[in-house]
Amino acid sequence: MNLSLNQLAILTIIAALPLMLLPELPSRSTILALAALAIVCTVVPLRNITLLALVVLMLCWMLWSARGALWQVETYSQNILPARVVVDRVTPDGKRAQIRLLTVHERWVFPPVHASVALPKQDHVYCAGQRWQMRLKLRPVHSQLNEGDFDQQRYALANHHILQGQVMSASVIDEKCSIRSQFLTNTQSVYQHLPWSGVLTALAFGERGELSAELSKLFRETGTAHLMAISGMHIGLAAGFGWILARGLQFLLPAKWIGHLFPLAITLLVAGLYTWLSGAHPPAQRAMLALLLWTAIRVSGKNWHGWHIWNLCIAALLLLDPLMILSESFWLSAFAVAALIAWYQWFPLPESLSQGIKSYPLKLLHLQAGMMILMLPVQAWVFSGLSLSALPANLMAIPVISLLTVPLILLALALPFSPIEEMLWWLADRSVAAVILCLRAFPSGWLAIEDALLMLICLPLAALIVWRFGWWRHAPLSLAGCCCALAIWRLTIPKPEWRVDMLDVGHGLAIVISKQGKAILYDTGNRWLNSNAGERIIIPWLERKGLQPEWIILSHGHLDHTGGLQAIQQRWPDISVRSALAHDRHFPCHAGESWQWYQLNFSVLWPRTSSTSGGNNDSCVVRIDDGRTAILLTGDIEREAELALLAAHRHQLRADILQVPHHGSSTSSVAPLLRAVAGKAALTSVARYNAWRMPSRQVIERYQQNGYAAYDTATEGQISVQITSNGWQVLGFRTHLLPRWYHQWFGVPRDSR
């Protein structure tokens, strides 16, 4: 059976899709057995069987690659490793580095193993390209997982950096920095004094670590963040720069030496150099591969359709690196190119409007409008929101960045040590300043998208497709049937009467009680050096769920429970706070307080009125019930407070679900308390790699002995309790809400206990 390259490409893309959806990977023996069966089936003289066998065979290659990534985790995350490494990248603050293991125990490592490590404090300056002998303590990346949150595990796998750890000791083998690192350092010294040097570094070298949080937020909210990541547009500009350079050189050559291959070769050379200078990040690599394929097609003299080239590029990328299918930036790039092809194929600008220089603004508007409409569903899915100012912001920023800033940077990179180098960098900096000045003038236009609206976001794209193919004329009944089926499916999704969600905030606590679109927060998570759980996790989660928080209950005053308070109050200034901290603006949270909220009964059982210090044993213990199901929230109380609580309110403690006190420490969860509560489920908020190795193994066993099903956020991610009139159920993110092989607990089972 003869198959075209386009057909093989489509089969490859189909074969890669299950890698996104599988809850777990088959064993290596199963993969080999499937591959052997597929090879046998390829000789069957039936077209459909042969096609299926080819898909299975390519799927086996994808699964084998994924298995290989997990094998690296299992092999290199158990003991301290003596390794020879090369430094790939160092963070601007010099505290962390990405390394590549060359040898382990004097054995060469293949395929390469990458890790992100904390560097030891010493006088030596690290830089990319250096070779070191290190003793490494590595462990798998373990992500905090919540609905709509950044998926660090998936990101780490897609970028082949699933190991992290620390350097126990290090001795230098070769301290010479790489040519790129030396060039970067020398070049930065020329423009480092300029106001927007961080943006220049991002555009020239692909290093975005110097961009401030405020600037990153500005680019995200105006929909211009893609301009700061070196990708197809930037590599294309470099290729165009190379083509112009080559054509200029050809004016100096004899006519017999002038041909079409020379400009193509220089185009590839310049684009390749820029890809290398930019650090060869995945988006730049993808663009370079696409350029190579396009060049090969041009040289071959074949006339391929845009969709065929797209299929071939996507298939080639997935064959070379199957885990790329887990990358959100890959999907954004792929859909962006597909949107361009579809827009110009389906909705071309009329010829009467596309003639002459005056038509360029209209062409740009046509392009941006098409990208905005067609990319709407993908952007909403990836970013959980949309920028309302993206169209005008991009209409302003893209011409300046693409026609002025990047060409100036390319000229400056091509003319190092020349008299005009510093002037070129200054001009590039001024162009960036103008763009940022205009972006800051736009009103805040970021719109968080609720889960319930994600389907509606797809309607403009669906309407365009229906109109373009004339389905509303040719198949109105089928179209109406599909719409009715979708509406019925959406309306019949079972909804709980109320729910309780323990968010995965690492070491800390944040619980959301929600009903009828309103919410109460019990604690607000931790605060870290540059962010907090409120800003990073809780606020985006509430916005995605379409919830309006009305109250915050602070269990006590420790930072891992109050870290996100300020950010949440800034987002919702009218929110009320209840605590036992004797704060002037806080409502009291002491034993004896009770109230109703949307037919839910809240009763405070602890602490005593005199307790205001905000320590663990002064935690505000709250019982919530609807008359059928009860939940007991205990904060961080320990043995002393637990026994006092038992003595004072033994008969009021009964509940179905218990929030495990003090993250499951060995100083809490006494057996009499567990028997008095007589619950069925125990929920613990804890980080996998916490310094205290919580929850304690003895405490977990104590819960199990008393009939509780034990859940913790380190294992499950977000834990959701959905309550209906018929009962309740506990759903973990990793095991129920989104069970995927790349969400699982990698490495030694429960190795932080």
What positions do the PLM features span?
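N-terminal leader/targeting segments
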Residues: 1-74, 164-167, 179, 286, ...
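Membrane-interface helix/helix-cap signal primarily in integral membrane proteins
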Residues: 2, 58-226, 532, 536-540, ...
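Membrane-interface micro-motifs in multi-pass membrane enzymes
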Residues: 4-5, 22-29, 228-236, 277-291, ...
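Alpha-helical transmembrane segments
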Residues: 4-18, 267-269, 311-315, 370
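Internal transmembrane alpha-helical bundles of multi-pass membrane proteins
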Residues: 13, 280-460, 472, 645-658, ...
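Structural signal for the C-terminal ends of transmembrane alpha-helices
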Residues: 22, 39-48, 64-66, 245-252, ...
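Non-globular, low-confidence helical/coil segments that flank catalytic cores
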Residues: 122-135, 161, 352-358, 413-753
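Aromatic-rich juxtamembrane segments at the membrane interface
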Residues: 158-290, 296, 595, 602, ...
